[in-house]
Amino acid sequence: MAVMEMACPGAPGSAVGQQKELPKAKEKTPPLGKKQSSVYKLEAVEKSPVFCGKWEILNDVITKGTAKEGSEAGPAAISIIAQAECENSQEFSPTFSERIFIAGSKQYSQSESLDQIPNNVAHATEGKMARVCWKGKRRSKARKKRKKKSSKSLAHAGVALAKPLPRTPEQESCTIPVQEDESPLGAPYVRNTPQFTKPLKEPGLGQLCFKQLGEGLRPALPRSELHKLISPLQCLNHVWKLHHPQDGGPLPLPTHPFPYSRLPHPFPFHPLQPWKPHPLESFLGKLACVDSQKPLPDPHLSKLACVDSPKPLPGPHLEPSCLSRGAHEKFSVEEYLVHALQGSVSSGQAHSLTSLAKTWAARGSRSREPSPKTEDNEGVLLTEKLKPVDYEYREEVHWATHQLRLGRGSFGEVHRMEDKQTGFQCAVKKVRLEVFRAEELMACAGLTSPRIVPLYGAVREGPWVNIFMELLEGGSLGQLVKEQGCLPEDRALYYLGQALEGLEYLHSRRILHGDVKADNVLLSSDGSHAALCDFGHAVCLQPDGLGKSLLTGDYIPGTETHMAPEVVLGRSCDAKVDVWSSCCMMLHMLNGCHPWTQFFRGPLCLKIASEPPPVREIPPSCAPLTAQAIQEGLRKEPIHRVSAAELGGKVNRALQQVGGLKSPWRGEYKEPRHPPPNQANYHQTLHAQPRELSPRAPGPRPAEETTGRAPKLQPPLPPEPPEPNKSPPLTLSKEESGMWEPLPLSSLEPAPARNPSSPERKATVPEQELQQLEIELFLNSLSQPFSLEEQEQILSCLSIDSLSLSDDSEKNPSKASQSSRDTLSSGVHSWSSQAEARSSSWNMVLARGRPTDTPSYFNGVKVQIQSLNGEHLHIREFHRVKVGDIATGISSQIPAAAFSLVTKDGQPVRYDMEVPDSGIDLQCTLAPDGSFAWSWRVKHGQLENRP
């Protein structure tokens, strides 16, 4: 066995090598002590020299080795033990020939003093060799025999070194943990494992075993470069020490030790949890609050030092400086998905689209800000027939709309679109971001029922959300009713049955449509297929089945004429709401007009809550099973109302009773059905009962009054003369009219009467109606979710005759606009059919002065437009709406093919001018093709700008 010396490259005089040490052996050695010389003599006697002549130096190398005691003046060196493999072949196999190298840092570990240099020289005083980290593969018998003889001679002579060395083996005092292994790769090749910066003061086996993670992590001097050489955990501890020198404690300690023979993984801890709103940031990156922009330490750092402990242990816990966010807030996979989807358009799955739609709804529900200048483009397409290009899908670039508009509603309009790359055509619904609801996509995304219009994807482009869906060439069921007047019983049952199939499919997935009506049922090109669409009012029900209230302070679902009583009363709602609405749709198909409108005017919400269900509007010619099915679906209490599946079975049996579907797809026009006089008199008598409280009112007076008033609510019949001429006008004294003088409502203008010969009645009948409404509202106040002041506010809004829409006004919107009449058109740039206008107006009425998603008296801008025939349109629109958009929205109410808007004094206005918050007063002007007076116009519903 020989001991060789290898110089350290980092120390001075590093050129010392083995060849330089050998000649030094020829020099005269100092006299040895008594014990040392005796050992030398014993070895010389027992073994004869092997080499002679100039190679005698090798005898000393083999027998004594070359290890020397280091001196302060000599060069710094690391001594290693080398031993021959066999006697014949003098090969040296060093026990440790590699320096400590830390992977990833490209640096050798540097010790601070020579005392930390590992020295594996055996301690002669202990009479045994230090444990070897590497064992040779071959052990010859001669080696074992020589080792045995050497140990015996040492024990017999009691040899000891002149200068005692440390009693602890150098492997144990080494600052670098040495891993014992039976494999030849047992050299301590460290992979970013925690390193000590100073040697342990009292080395022992317990420190080798790493019983406590973080033991010895006490840096004497702050060294900012340590993060390159140690693990991230120690780096965090080091940074903490630099900023908090007064806290000398280490990071929290683990509760379970681990064996020293297995070095710990750099991160055997809990998963790192990022901070909102940057889910994909790195662990040591932007840990800062969004609002304060201050460094935000991670509150989960205490968990980094806990291997299995569920609670943070004592130590330098880092408290968050932003208390607005929860300390234990965790990110879900959905949030990471949304972060990856934002800012691009891609083809994906339905769940990706719904996750992204939530961010759109949240952005639109914030306080209204100026429209973004940049046209952001992001979304998910669910079909391969719509292909994004370079992660974009923009209008007029990748797809284009056709000139003809398929339909429009209170929140948007529907066009036919075509993909420029594939040529695929479908329908696109354009919705403003401010009124977009995520439920519109969450409810229908991924549905596969043939009774639900398939969704092809949605893309947000600036302030607009474009929803792509299947194109059904047959139009809507509401358009068919307008074209046909009213539908035959068999065809109405046929479409109702298909709509109930779609509702049954939705209800099985706990989805409430919320706005079932004829306008939201689309038909195929041959009229044989019907499917539900427009999930703008859809609600996802809770799995417990308890339902939820749909009526809130700033949102009213559905259409007023199809609204269920529990919705009006603000009670808990479930899937039975859609059943009520479907039966109201059935009455619309059979009668050609919406329910309730033939008997009542004004705020129908109070009538729906107080009056019996509209079963009297069932045509007498209907089959018994048809009438029974409608009655079962119009039960006022939801618990007594049938489900969609049960009603579907009744409708199918009723269709079989009438002989199945036999009527043609598009037959002859039929006049809408009007209620018989006795039913009208009955309803109006109930409505006029408070007049009997007057002592001057004779007994038959209410009957006469209702006789004269009933035809007023009926659409005019051309073959017959006006009904009011058949009855004498109603005269009321001033005292009698003064008795019904509600102070909050006295300034309201009455609706114009049809009979010009009764001027007094023109003023007294609306007062009577308002008085009756006020009494009913007070009686129902316990069931209404409104305070007394809010009820008076509702009455003051509802009393405006904007809601008095007769059936003939539905057919001709221009007739509905009378002098000084406020249409309350709302939604997206006044896009509203008459049915939708009723729904949106009801939505505004119950807004109660709070910020709403639709413009109202309280949060919209006022726009007054004088039509070509002198009528005034009073419109409430969104803030920052443009004049051109308003003109496009009212194009159906202007009796001209092409028109433009100017100020009251005739000055032109730009089509892109935003309406100021104070409002604007405009008037219509003709814009024919041959005129050069207009710079822009609206022709056939399309905005044109003169180049």
Swiss-Prot record:
Residues 135-151 have a biased composition (Basic residues). Weakly expressed in testis, small intestine, spleen, thymus, peripheral blood leukocytes, prostate, ovary and colon. Its main location: cytoplasm. Residues 1-37, 135-171, 662-766, 805-830 are annotated as: Disordered. Residues 400-655 form the Protein kinase domain. Changing residue 514 to K: In a lung neuroendocrine carcinoma sample; somatic mutation; requires 2 nucleotide substitutions. The keyword Transcription regulation does not apply. Residues 814-829 have a biased composition (Polar residues). Residues 665-674 have a biased composition (Basic and acidic residues). Autophosphorylated. Phosphorylation at Thr-559 is required to activate its kinase activity and 'Lys-63'-linked polyubiquitination. Phosphorylated by CHUK/IKKA leading to MAP3K14 destabilization. The active site is at residue 515. InterPro entries: Kinase-like_dom_sf, M3K14_STKc, MAP_kinase_kinase_kinase, MAPKKK14, Prot_kinase_dom, Protein_kinase_ATP_BS, Ser/Thr_kinase_AS. ATP binds at residues 406-414, 429. The modification Phosphothreonine is found at residue 559. It holds the Pfam family Pkinase. Residues 741-752 have a biased composition (Low complexity). Interacts with TRAF2, TRAF5, TRAF6, IKKA and NFKB2/P100. Interacts with TRAF3 and PELI3. Interacts with NIBP; the interaction is direct. Interacts with ARRB1 and ARRB2. Interacts with GRB10. Interacts with ZFP91. Interacts with NLRP12; this interaction promotes proteasomal degradation of MAP3K14. Directly interacts with DDX3X. Interacts (via C-terminus and kinase domain) with PPPC3A (via N-terminus) and PPP3CB. It is linked to Immunodeficiency 112: An autosomal recessive, primary immunologic disorder characterized by variable abnormalities affecting lymphoid immunity, including hypogammaglobulinemia, lymphopenia or paradoxical lymphocytosis, and recurrent bacterial, viral, and fungal infections. Lymphotoxin beta-activated kinase which seems to be exclusively involved in the activation of NF-kappa-B and its transcriptional activity. Phosphorylates CHUK/IKKA, thereby promoting proteolytic processing of NFKB2/P100, which leads to NF-kappa-B activation via the non-canonical pathway. Has an essential role in the non-canonical NF-kappa-B signaling that regulates genes encoding molecules involved in B-cell survival, lymphoid organogenesis, and immune response. Could act in a receptor-selective manner. This is Mitogen-activated protein kinase kinase kinase 14. It comes from Homo sapiens. The gene is MAP3K14.
